[in-house]
């Protein structure tokens, strides 16, 4: 095929590196932090640091202490002595009354886990300002609630709530404009997942937040919600004995995170009876080595929307190449110059889907497995990584691995020309201009959106 010769060439694994964006609290990397306020404890707050260090030392049996990375000067937890693989660092009870953990209680049927935890944070902060009890103010959960960053975190929250009084005149109108413009940005970038996640979140929080009535209360609630989304762990019962729930654990929140698996040296689990949350060493850890948790498999969109930064490196970032198997196969049919009504191709496509288990059997016949996550199978990731489903489908329909890879390269070039041409760049900059002038969005958030788009461009370029 002529198109195959045109795109078959030696692959280069290198590409221009994208901008590094990350949080000093949540992400570990080797360049200066972009957002210093994301650290849980501000440098210079000696009393806060002393209180937290005492908690860390006590509850880790002197295995860990607060310290600073010599290169980045980012605060984190460091090994106070050598720690063996599988050795426990923290063992935190998941009882509601335990002072070391916030647990969503779902006592109010109108609240989901995020609302439950946000209200607990606000209650602790409120009580600390009205109580004369010094012991209560030093209690870990109260100290934690008061040490959280004052700024609202995450673009999703800044689209759904009042943002630190930066919006003028008609706040509701400005907020809605910001939300719509960010949705337009995701549309222009072709990031359907990010747009859907933002829309789902806005719908989820809008009715709940409006119940507060007063602007000041809504602002506080939005702030608390923004803290909760980037600091919780999901607890699931493998035996199905109870519904999943979320927890916030102040001591564990002091750990920095990484998306680079080689840097991760601690992991977490829940006891089988769901009675405790445990952090343990993933491998042997040397004295004075920083303790690092993994972010897990998260796309950049989640960090952008809810964490307020992008990891310096994220092997789990991706670009969607096709929505589903039908779009992929129809595109390939067109690439080969076949008529869209060609019955021979219809039979080939059906056979391909059947062979790969992408059809489910029903009494009335076969139908496409239209799982909501199907489109996440057809993705490109950093370092020119093509997901297995894409390769399997294209190999099956073409019968040749080189042709499958060549087809992916053609598709990547096509997406670049459709979403990242000079006209597209100009359109994106117009959106940014409106965000700055009409909604007073922070310049740093604009740069974050720009970096997100550039990283997607880099992923596409790497495969070509």
Task: Kindly give the residue locations of the regions a language model identified.
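Hydrophobic/aromatic hotspots within intrinsically disordered, low-complexity regions
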Residues: 3, 21, 35-41
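Intrinsically disordered, low-complexity polar regions and short flexible loop motifs
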Residues: 113-114
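Intrinsically disordered Ser/Thr phosphorylation hotspots
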Residues: 15, 31-32
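Ala/Thr-enriched low-complexity intrinsically disordered regions
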Residues: 8-10, 36-39, 130
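Cysteine-centered motifs
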Residues: 27-31, 38
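Long, positively charged leader/targeting segments at protein N-termini
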Residues: 43-96, 100-108, 125-128, 136-464
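N-terminal chloroplast transit peptides
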Residues: 1-24
